[in-house]
């Protein structure tokens, strides 16, 4: 693995812990260069990529696809419902097959935590693995686009007061972000229902009531309530959650003028955030979506650099 002039070389991208700080900053800066139109794009038509999504996705799936097509890669169609998965084929055997067919990169989202371990450790699978989200584990590409969005706004991470709010236990976005933001020097706070908070998060920040910290925040990162990962026993209503933990109009008015609001989406309007605030002046939710394409271009380029030994 290496970084030269913001050009990164990676074998796989499965978690934020696996990246050095230099690689993280290199990917962010390279994404910014793609966004500014400063990168001359090489011909990658011979490079094959398959997006293997076993959970529903709009932003991650389609922004990877846009990124791949902007880079000129050949994108292989894959529909889990129309594949041998419906006949009981395992993820491992699916990826083994794609690799045997000559696929260079597999971008994968799967409901199982750490699904990627047996794939990257396999002596037979030669395709590089990019983790598009594993269960409640990690979401490295979302984390990197979040970092780009923050860096565009403030030009730094050191000393920023950032709150990550909501469904913390079930959020792969929260886990990826808290680990790297702590490493980059941000001051982290967490809030949300106590039953969705783990003491393991104390290693990264402070659990606090939203109304105690909101006036001091630079970044408020809201998380989607992930109903699909709950057991059906919730102790709150939609309205109750919004009033207790959501970004209401009243709380929005207490934010600093320079503060920004983030959300990985999809948004549960009037739950995590008031409907009228999704596109408010302090909101950067649409910017996050746009930045996803450029960061994912940087990720795909980094994998190709690693495979082709370009650096």
Swiss-Prot record:
Catalytic activity: carbamoyl phosphate + L-aspartate = N-carbamoyl-L-aspartate + phosphate + H(+)
Domain of life, source organism: Bacteria
Positions that bind L-aspartate: 87, 172, 224
GO MF, one example: amino acid binding
GO terms for biological process, alphabetical: 'de novo' pyrimidine nucleobase biosynthetic process; 'de novo' UMP biosynthetic process; amino acid metabolic process
EC number: 2.1.3.2
GO cellular component, one term: cytosol
Matches recorded under PROSITE patterns: CARBAMOYLTRANSFERASE
Pfam family, one: OTCace_N
Presence of keyword Transferase: yes
UniProt-annotated binding residues for carbamoyl phosphate: 59-60, 109, 139, 142, 265-266
Protein name: Aspartate carbamoyltransferase catalytic subunit
PANTHER family: ASPARTATE CARBAMOYLTRANSFERASE, ORNITHINE CARBAMOYLTRANSFERASE, MITOCHONDRIAL
């Amino acid at each position: 693995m290496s970084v030269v002039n913001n050009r990164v070389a990676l074998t796989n991208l499965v978690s934020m812990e696996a990246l050095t700080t230099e690689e993280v900053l290199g990917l962010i800066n390279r994404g910014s260069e793609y966004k500014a139109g400063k990168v001359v794009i090489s011909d990658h038509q011979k490079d094959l990529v398959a997006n293997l999504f076993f959970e529903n996705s709009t932003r991650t799936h389609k922004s990877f696809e846009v990124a791949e097509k902007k880079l000129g890669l050949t994108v292989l169609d894959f529909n889990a419902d129309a594949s041998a998965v419906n006949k009981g084929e395992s993820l491992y055997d699916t990826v083994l097959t794609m690799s045997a067919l000559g696929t260079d990169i597999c971008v994968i989202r799967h409901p199982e935590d750490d699904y990627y371990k047996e794939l990257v450790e396999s002596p037979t699978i030669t395709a590089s693995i990019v983790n598009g989200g594993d269960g409640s584990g990690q979401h490295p590409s979302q984390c990197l686009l979040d970092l780009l969005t923050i860096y565009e706004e403030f030009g730094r991470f050191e000393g920023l007061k950032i709150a990550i709010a909501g469904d913390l236990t079930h959020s792969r976005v929260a886990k990826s972000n808290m680990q790297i933001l702590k490493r980059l020097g941000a001051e982290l706070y967490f809030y949300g229902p106590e039953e969705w908070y783990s003491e393991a998060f104390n290693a990264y920040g402070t659990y606090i009531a939203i109304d105690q910290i909101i006036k001091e925040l630079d970044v408020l990162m809201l998380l989607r309530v992930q109903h699909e990962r709950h057991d059906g026993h919730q102790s709150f209503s939609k309205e109750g959650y919004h009033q207790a933990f959501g970004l209401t109009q009243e709380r929005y008015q207490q934010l600093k003028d320079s503060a920004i609001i983030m959300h990985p989406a999809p948004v549960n309007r009037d739950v995590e955030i008031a409907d009228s605030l999704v596109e408010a002046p302090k909101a950067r939710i649409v910017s996050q979506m746009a930045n996803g394409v450029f960061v994912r271009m940087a990720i795909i380029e980094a994998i190709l650099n690693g495979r082709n030994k370009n650096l």
